[in-house]
Structures are given as structure tokens and as C-alpha cells.
């Protein structure tokens, strides 16, 4: 996710490349980031010093180590902290980051990997922040897709719906593509057909504002092939499987 965010920041127009500093312990990764036109360092403290917004994007079990490692070099009056790590609680972050009774402005953020292509669905939960800071962080992530302000309670649901949801959507694309091959299309052609169909469905909903079921009604004629296909999917638990998968991912 960290690499995807860097790509999104570079492609977006919120921050200039020369103002982006990335910390990574891996030399090959630092070289990759440097080739993208940003500053790369092995030092978390160096990357955090002087930044307006410090984004910590690591595995959940590394968050405490990284935060306590940069806490003493951060300016609590000038900087903001964004933590991207599923399942990490605000109470833990407050425990790790409170310094002399003061807490740095902090946000819990869950994007998805489409952030690299400026198409993320991002959830932002303010932990400690005023209205201006919330607006600034939302503007940052809106340049890399779409973001909504939510509360910590809904981050788990947001993760499975949008972050895990990327994988669920890919699984449908794979299944439909395999079906296309069985129907006689070459694999690459089938994938392209399915991707364009998905894109068209999304655009139709965005432009018209229709409920998905109303859009389905536009293409289901009585006794036609579309309703037969839909009913066969439902007989095999299509909708139920999707909902059960989402609920399982949110546990």
C-alpha cells in the first residue's frame, strides 16, 4: 500500500514531487522511489522531520515501533499524522504518541490499491483534528480518488467493502473472463470485454444516479437471456455469497 500511495501522490496534483520524502529500509525500494522523482531515505526520523503531513503506511504490527521511533522529532503544533494500517485502534495511537500530555493531530485512513491510479475509495477517520485539518487531509486523498469522512467504528466495514472489495471485484472479472473463454473468446479479448462492461456499468450508475436494480431492469426483457442468466446466478447464491463474503471480511 505504501508504494501505491507514493505513486498516487506523484500522479496527483496536491504535492510537488520534490516535497515528497519516503522512508524505506529496503535499498531496492528506495532506488525505485528515487527513480520516480521523490526523495528516499532509510531513516523514518529524517522523513518525518519538517513534513506537513506524516503518513505511516506499514503492517499493523509495525505501527507502534514506527510511531514511537518518530514521536520525539515531530512538531505537534505544525504537523499532522496519517496512519494507514488496518485494525490499529486510536486508543493505541494516543498511547504511543501522546507527548507531555499533548496529542498530535491524527487520522486513521484506509485507502485501496487503486490509489496508485488516482481511483481509490478512501475512508478517513479523524482521531484528533480540527475542521481545517480534516478538510486538508480530505483534499489530499480526494486528489487520488474519492474519500469520505467516517468514524473509527466503520473503518472495518469500509476496509472489506472498498479495500478488500478490489479483490472481490477482480474475482468477478476473472470468473466472467473464464466464462467468456468457454463461450469462445480468446482470453485477452474476454478480459477486455468484461473490464469494459464493468466500466460501462459504473459510468451508467454515476451519470444517471439509478439504483443498480433499476439499471438491471433496463436490460432484462421478459423471458430474455439476461433474466435467465441472473436467475441462474441467484439460484447458485450469487447475492448471498457476496454479502457473506463482505461480512466475513469485516469480522
Predicted regions and their residues:
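Internal alpha-helical scaffold of NAD(P)-dependent oxidoreductase catalytic cores
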Residues: 92, 96-105, 121-157, 168-208
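NAD(P)-dependent Rossmann-like dehydrogenase/reductase catalytic/cofactor-binding core
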Residues: 195-251
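Rossmann-like NAD(P)(H) cofactor-binding subdomain of soluble oxidoreductases
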Residues: 36, 44-121
Amino acid at each position: 500500500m505504501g508504494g501505491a500511495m507514493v505513486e498516487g501522490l506523484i500522479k496527483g496534483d496536491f504535492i510537488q514531487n520534490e516535497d515528497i520524502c519516503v522512508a524505506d529500509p529496503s535499498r531496492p525500494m528506495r532506488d525505485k522511489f528515487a527513480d520516480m522523482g521523490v526523495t528516499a531515505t532509510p531513516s523514518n526520523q529524517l522523513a518525518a522531520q519538517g513534513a506537513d503531513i506524516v503518513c505511516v503506511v506499514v503492517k499493523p504490527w509495525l505501527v507502534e515501533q514506527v510511531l514511537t521511533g518518530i514521536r520525539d522529532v515531530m512538531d505537534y503544533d505544525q504537523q499532522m499524522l496519517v496512519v494507514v494500517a488496518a485494525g490499529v485502534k486510536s486508543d493505541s495511537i494516543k498511547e504511543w504518541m501522546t507527548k507531555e500530555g499533548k496529542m498530535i493531530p491524527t487520522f486513521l485512513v484506509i485507502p485501496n490499491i487503486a490509489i496508485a491510479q488516482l481511483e481509490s475509495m478512501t475512508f478517513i477517520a479523524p482521531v484528533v483534528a480540527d475542521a481545517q485539518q480534516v478538510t486538508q487531509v480530505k483534499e489530499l486523498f480526494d486528489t487520488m480518488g474519492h474519500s469520505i469522512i467516517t468514524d473509527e467504528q466503520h473503518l472495518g466495514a469500509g476496509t472489506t467493502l472498498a479495500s478488500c472489495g478490489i479483490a472481490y471485484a477482480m474475482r468477478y472479472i476473472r470468473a466472467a473472463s473464464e466464462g467468456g473463454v468457454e463461450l469462445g473468446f480468446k482470453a485477452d479479448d474476454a478480459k477486455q470485454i468484461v473490464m469494459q462492461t464493468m466500466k460501462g456499468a459504473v459510468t451508467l450508475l454515476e451519470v444517471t444516479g439509478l439504483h443498480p436494480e433499476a439499471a438491471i431492469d433496463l436490460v432484462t426483457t421478459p423471458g430474455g437471456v439476461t433474466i435467465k442468466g441472473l436467475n441462474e446466478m441467484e439460484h447458485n447464491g450469487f447475492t448471498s455469497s457476496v454479502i457473506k463474503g463482505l461480512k466475513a471480511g469485516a469480522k
